[in-house]
């Protein structure tokens, strides 16, 4: 018995300590709850109610504040196009309090920036800044810092990366690739003509050495959508010249010829950047040549050497090219992102990150 007494005393002492701690914890929680109940403001109460609405939603609700360029998309397409389930897209701003995500297109933000700065935001809601234009073609707006939680753009270091297109493995559903019939050597379709653009200066020199079939608003030869793809497909080479040069900025000017069975001749970021997203032997980079004249000689050589030309399509044995769905894909990929990433943060330096 003597040996057991110290053990019993320790047990009793431990129980007393636990009871005291429990009582103290209850007091703290009860006091905090009572204080919150009496001092909570109307704005805080509305915010908590909004958070409750969000928690009650079974699907992830994505509110597209305004469809980019007014092009409304079918809102049930996340599962159909991208196999992303559990997402509900809406453009009804009355569902703001229920939305897990609110998407804002940069080009439209200037219209209601002052309104955004004043808007009450539900506790669990995330705002996504969406942009597919380069910094040169995006208005730099004040007060974007500390406003958004996530970024969705063509840049590969965005939170949600949405390129203009993708190279994907060819499936059984894809038809065996055959190079389309070609009756033109080099083509270019362009609307935005600016003598200060590098692409215009390069084109002006290149056309001195090789015939280029030109189309688009800049040449007063507009094409319908059907004519557009048919024209690209009929050319051996297509000038995929970007209007501005930034890392990761390769647009539909690159992916449309890849999808159409044409070899893109690219002017944009360095070759190494392109090779991070498309096969190295699927395109020609203007930087591969010392001058436009040297490039022209290479194109004319390829015109006379079918076997060498066909090597640009070796990758099509295993892969194919797909376009993205502007606006819709941003919304669906953002939904997928927050379903897999629950952490909450605020983007502190969006302006510096994007415009430098």
Label the predicted regions:
Residues 133-136:
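A short, histidine- and acid-enriched strand-loop-helix "catalytic/donor-clamping" loop
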Residues 2-129, 139-356:
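Pol beta-like nucleotidyltransferase catalytic core
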């Amino acid at each position: 018995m003597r040996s057991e007494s110290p053990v019993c005393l320790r047990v009793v002492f431990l129980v007393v300590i636990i009871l005291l701690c429990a009582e103290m914890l209850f007091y703290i929680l009860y006091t905090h709850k009572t204080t919150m109940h009496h001092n909570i403001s109307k704005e805080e109460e509305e915010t908590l109610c909004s958070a409750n609405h969000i928690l009650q939603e079974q699907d992830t609700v994505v509110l597209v504040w305004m469809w980019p360029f007014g092009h409304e998309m079918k809102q049930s397409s996340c599962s159909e196009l991208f196999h992303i389930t559990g997402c509900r897209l809406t453009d009804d701003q009355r569902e703001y309090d229920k939305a897990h995500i609110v998407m804002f297109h940069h080009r439209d933000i200037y219209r209601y920036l002052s309104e955004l700065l004043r808007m009450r935001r539900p506790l669990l809601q995330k705002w996504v800044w969406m942009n597919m234009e380069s910094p040169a073609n995006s208005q730099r707006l004040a007060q974007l810092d500390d406003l958004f939680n996530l970024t969705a753009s063509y840049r590969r270091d965005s939170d949600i990366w949405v390129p203009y297109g993708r190279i994907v493995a060819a499936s059984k559903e894809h038809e065996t690739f055959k190079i389309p019939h070609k009756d033109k050597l080099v083509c270019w379709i362009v609307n935005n003509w600016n003598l200060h653009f590098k692409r215009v200066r390069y084109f002006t020199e290149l056309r001195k050495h090789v015939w280029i079939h030109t189309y688009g608003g800049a040449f007063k030869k507009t094409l319908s959508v059907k004519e557009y793809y048919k024209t690209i497909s009929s050319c051996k080479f297509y000038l995929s010249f970007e209007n501005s040069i930034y890392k990761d900025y390769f647009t539909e000017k690159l992916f449309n010829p890849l999808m159409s069975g044409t070899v893109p001749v690219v002017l944009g970021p360095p070759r190494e950047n392109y090779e991070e997203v498309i096969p190295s032997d699927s395109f020609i980079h203007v930087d591969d040549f010392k001058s436009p004249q040297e490039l022209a000689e290479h194109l004319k050589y390829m015109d006379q050497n079918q076997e060498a030309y066909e090597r640009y399509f070796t990758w099509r044995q295993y892969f194919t090219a797909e376009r993205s769905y502007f606006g819709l894909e941003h919304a669906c990929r953002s939904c997928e992102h927050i379903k897999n990433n629950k952490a909450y943060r605020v983007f502190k330096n969006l302006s510096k990150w994007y415009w430098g």
